[in-house]
Regions:
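Intrinsically disordered regulatory tails of 7TM GPCRs
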Residues: 1-18, 215-229, 265-267, 299-330
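Extracellular N-terminal segment of 7TM GPCRs
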Residues: 1-41, 49, 178, 187-191
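Loop architecture of class A 7-transmembrane GPCRs
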Residues: 7-15, 83-97, 102, 133-137, ...
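Extracellular TM2-ECL1-early TM3 structural module of rhodopsin-like
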Residues: 17-29, 54-113, 121, 128-129
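Helix-to-loop junction signature of class
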Residues: 28, 32, 68-84, 97, ...
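Cytoplasm-facing ends of alpha-helical transmembrane segments in multi-pass membrane proteins
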Residues: 34-47, 63, 70-74, 102-126, ...
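Intracellular effector-coupling site of seven-transmembrane GPCRs
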Residues: 172-176, 180, 194, 211-251, ...
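Seventh transmembrane helix
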Residues: 244, 251, 275-324
Length: 330
C-alpha cells in the first residue's frame, strides 16, 4: 500500500499522523536527560554498596535494567520522527526496541521479586526460606536475564531480517519473517501473562505488608500516627507508580498486537497504535520514578547518598539525616 493511500486512510479515521509522529518522539527526548541523570546517580551509589542481601541483588539488577532502558530512549525517539532514515528505523526495530522491551520486562519481574522479598522479611520474619539466600537471588536473576534474552530478545533480533516493502507505520512488522511474526505474537502473550501475575503478586505482598506493619504499631500501642501515615504513603506510592506506568500499556498491548500481525489496516488499528505509543511512553517514565522509589524506600541507599561526595560542599545536617534514615525499608 502506497504512502498517499495510507495518509488518506488515517485522515478518514480523524487521525493527524504527522502530529503524533512528532509529539511522541519529543516526549521521549524530554524524558531522556532526567532519566539518565537519575539512573547514573543511583547506579553510582549502588556500585558503592555491597550485595549482602537478596534485596540488594534485586535492586542492583533493577537499576541495571532501568539504565539499559534509559540508553535506548534517544534511538527510539529519533527512529519515530517522520524524516528518520530507513537505516535508523531498521536498527531501532532490530536492536534498540528489543532491548527496550527486554529491560522493561526485566524491571517488572524484579519489582515483583522485591515485593516478595519484602513480604517474607516483614510478614514472616521468624522463618528463613531458601529463596531468601544471597546465592539463590544471584542465580535467579542470572537465569531470568538469560531466559528473557534467549526466549525473546535473540529470536526477535534473528527473525527481524527482512527488507521492508515500504516505509509505513508497520515498518518493524514488515521486517519480520513469517516465523518472526509468530514469535513476536507468542512473546507478547507470554510477557503479558508474566506481567499480570507480577501485578497480582505486588498488590498482595504490599497489602499484607501494610497490614502487618499497622498491626505491629497497634500491638506496641504506638500512638505515632505520622509513622502509620508514612507506611500507608509508601505502599500507595509503589502501587500508584506501578499501576499508572504499566497497567495502561499492558491493557492495550494484546488487542493491538492481534491487529498488528494482520495485513489489512483499519481505523481501530490506527487509533490503538496511537494509544499504544502513548501508554508505552508512560511505561518509560518509570525509569525516572524508580530512582525516587529507591531513595524513599531503601534506607541503606538513602544513607549512602547522603554520605556521598555530592554533599561534600554542604555542612552536615545530623538531625535531618537521622530522621530520614530511621524509617524501615520496604
Amino acid at each position: 500500500m502506497g504512502e498517499p493511500k495510507k495518509s488518506a486512510s488515517l485522515s478518514d479515521c480523524g487521525i493527524n499522523d504527522q502530529t503524533w509522529n512528532v509529539v511522541i518522539p519529543i516526549l521521549y527526548f524530554l524524558l531522556f536527560p532526567a532519566a539518565l541523570l537519575l539512573n547514573v546517580v543511583v547506579a553510582w551509589i549502588c556500585s558503592l554498596m555491597k550485595s549482602n542481601s537478596s534485596f540488594m541483588v534485586y535492586l542492583k539488577n533493577l537499576v541495571t535494567a532501568d539504565l539499559l532502558m534509559t540508553l535506548t530512549l534517544p534511538i527510539q525517539a529519533a527512529s519515530m520522527l517522520p524524516k528518520a532514515s530507513s537505516g535508523l528505523q531498521a536498527f531501532a526495530c532490530r536492536f534498540s526496541s528489543v532491548f527496550f522491551y527486554t529491560a522493561m520486562n526485566m524491571s517488572t519481574i524484579l519489582m515483583g521479586l522485591i515485593s516478595l522479598d519484602r513480604f517474607l522479611k516483614i510478614v514472616m520474619p521468624g522463618r528463613r526460606f531458601p529463596c531468601q539466600s544471597l546465592l539463590f537471588s544471584k542465580v535467579l536473576t542470572v537465569v531470568v536475564w538469560m531466559l528473557l534474552i534467549g526466549s525473546t530478545a535473540l529470536p526477535i533480533i534473528i527473525t527481524t531480517d527482512q527488507d521492508p516493502a515500504n516505509k509505513s507505520n508497520e515498518f518493524c512488522m514488515n521486517m519480520k519473517s513469517v516465523l518472526g511474526v509468530s514469535w513476536h505474537d507468542g512473546a507478547v502473550k507470554i510477557t503479558e501473562v508474566i506481567f499480570w501475575v507480577v501485578c497480582i503478586l505486588i498488590v498482595f505482598c504490599y497489602v499484607c505488608i501494610t497490614k502487618k506493619v499497622l498491626e505491629s504499631y497497634h500491638k506496641s500501642r504506638s500512638s505515632n500516627s505520622q509513622k502509620k501515615s508514612q507506611t500507608k504513603a509508601r505502599v500507595f506510592l509503589i502501587l500508584a507508580i506501578f499501576f499508572i506506568c504499566y497497567v495502561p500499556y499492558h491493557s492495550v498491548r494484546i488487542p493491538y498486537t492481534k491487529l498488528q500481525v494482520k495485513i489489512n489496516p483499519g481505523c481501530l488499528k490506527a487509533k490503538l497504535r496511537i494509544v499504544k505509543n502513548l501508554t508505552l511512553w508512560l511505561s518509560a517514565t518509570n525509569v525516572c520514578l524508580d530512582p525516587l522509589i529507591y531513595f524513599f524506600l531503601c534506607k541503606a541507599l538513602r544513607q549512602k547518598f547522603l554520605e556521598s561526595r555530592i554533599f561534600k560542599w554542604f555542612p552536615p545536617i545530623t538531625g535531618r539525616n537521622s530522621e530520614m534514615t530511621s524509617g524501615t525499608s520496604m
